[in-house]
A protein has these predicted regions:
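Secretory targeting signals
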Residues: 18, 22-82, 111-182, 200-207, ...
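Aromatic- and glycine-rich beta-strand/loop motifs that create alpha-glucan
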Residues: 1-26
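Junction motif at the cytosolic side of a transmembrane helix
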Residues: 253-276
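Central hydrophobic cores of alpha-helical transmembrane segments
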Residues: 22-27, 188-198, 215-218
Length: 276
């Protein structure tokens, strides 16, 4: 088992794919955190508050995780999602999975090893995302806003951890989906299209229909529920408030559930297919 895990981890980190995705994700995380930080201290044309008067623990959570939030299109999350898809579909496309299955006849060992390797690379991307987000947000807050960074605030520190968990889960969702849809081009296009446009369309549709409970189950909204545990406007802006999100722990459980279902079903189907 240990040898299989090491082999799968080595297989990932000896390619350029993971760090290429990491660079792209870091760039989006940096820019979106800059955008979120730029909202701090803004006022409406009539001089009234736009909602983000100053840095608090909740606004810090928003700023330092902006790239993953549904409100920002979960743009950073698309990279671990696509990486998860590519890691497994590349093996199917180039038949490298065949050699793995022949070398390790017990397919459940292969499935566990691959899943753990995906968790490792997802965690690495999560750390990269946190660093890039802090860098982008801190730059704007320090240079343009003269606001405290609150990097050691307990709520903000908690968001560092949940950001890493969220990145791991999005990578696993892509991995599980890639095992179900083995055509690489189709899998990537469908996953990314849903991650961006699909979630946007669902949010709009559910808002029009007034289906606030259904909207809570959208992955991007679950991610927001995980990362931002209080109203970043401090109640200054009227909104749906908590009605749009589950509690952070329930959001995390449901999102992890999505990844678990896709990964388990994909692994079972992969274990039953003939080696080609």
């Amino acid at each position: 088992m240990l040898g299989a895990i090491k082999s799968e981890i080595r297989k990932i980190f000896t390619t350029k794919l993971w760090w290429g995705m990491g660079i792209g994700m870091a760039a989006f995380a940096f820019l979106l955190s800059m955008a979120a930080a730029s909202l701090i201290g803004l006022t409406n044309p009539d001089g009234s508050s736009a909602g983000f008067d100053s840095m608090t623990g909740a606004t810090g959570q928003m700023v330092y995780s902006a790239g993953l939030l549904g409100e920002f299109g979960s743009m950073s999350a698309l990279f671990p999602l696509a990486l998860g898809v590519l890691l497994i579909t590349t093996e199917y496309r180039h038949k490298t999975a065949t050699a793995t299955y022949l070398a390790t006849p017990r397919r459940w060992i292969v499935a566990v090893a691959k899943t753990l390797a995906v968790i490792v690379v997802g965690a690495v991307l999560g750390v990269v995302h946190v660093i890039a987000s802090v860098g982008g947000g801190a730059l704007v807050l320090t240079v343009f806003k003269d606001q405290p960074l609150l990097l050691g605030n307990s709520d903000v520190v908690a968001t560092y951890g949940t950001s890493i968990v969220a990145t791991v889960v999005w990578t696993l969702i892509g991995f599980g989906f890639g095992m179900l849809v083995r055509n690489q081009i189709a899998a990537v296009l469908i996953a990314v299209a849903f991650g961006f446009l699909g979630q946007l369309i669902l949010n709009i549709a559910f808002a029009i229909l007034g289906w606030t409970t259904a909207a809570k189950f959208i992955p991007g909204n679950l991610t927001t529920g995980m990362l931002v545990t209080a109203d970043p406007t401090g109640g200054a802006v009227e909104s749906g408030g908590d009605s749009y999100y589950f509690s952070w722990w329930l959001s995390a459980l449901i999102l992890i559930g999505y990844a678990a279902v896709l990964t388990v079903i994909g692994s079972i189907l992969a274990g039953r297919k003939d080696i080609t």
